[in-house]
A protein has these predicted regions:
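Thiamine diphosphate
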Residues: 1-162
Length: 162
């Protein structure tokens, strides 16, 4: 990704939470494209994907707390022409799924979006098990993987549309 489109007239939206920007953007993308899929791992409330589930139930799958399997499902959906967006806490969307992301997504050149919420040390309220230091670094080592860490809701919305 050489350029994130839509940021030429950048204005910060300081009143919007990242999860709300995610929810609004995914609702728009779901309306525009039936191939958009949202995959959750029992975190629809914390990731604000419940509205997408209500609006597009056929485009939503809750796989339960099994992040590694969810990456395999995302890869399979991508191989069949869908565009999956997988939501998980950052530590579980990176360290826990590394092998599946490497082989099933990167090595296979598939278009699966893995969204890790509360990346890095940003999830202090959830304790040390949710605070990886290496999350972005290990994902950057995967061939064909693009790692983006949007700083605010405007950047997040732009990245999701790419």
């Amino acid at each position: 990704m050489n350029k994130i489109s839509g940021l030429s007239n950048y204005r910060a939206d300081n009143d919007k939470a990242m999860r709300d920007a995610y929810s609004e953007t995914m609702l728009k993308l779901g309306a525009e494209n039936d191939n958009i899929m949202v995959l959750d791992v029992d975190c629809s409330r914390s990731m604000a994907s419940g509205d997408f589930k209500k609006a597009y139930p056929a485009q939503y799958i809750n796989l339960g707390i099994q992040e590694a399997n969810a990456v395999g499902v995302a890869a399979g959906l991508s191989a069949e022409g869908q565009i999956p967006f997988l939501n998980a806490f950052g530590v579980f969307a990176t360290r826990r799924v590394f092998d599946q992301a490497f082989l099933s997504c990167g090595y296979a050149h598939l278009n699966a979006k893995i969204i890790g919420w509360d990346a890095g040390v940003g999830a202090e309220t959830n304790g040390g098990t949710h605070m990886p230091f290496e999350d972005a670094g290990i994902m950057r080592s995967i061939p064909e993987m693009t790692v983006v860490e949007p700083a605010d809701p405007v950047a997040l919305a732009a990245v999701l549309k790419e």
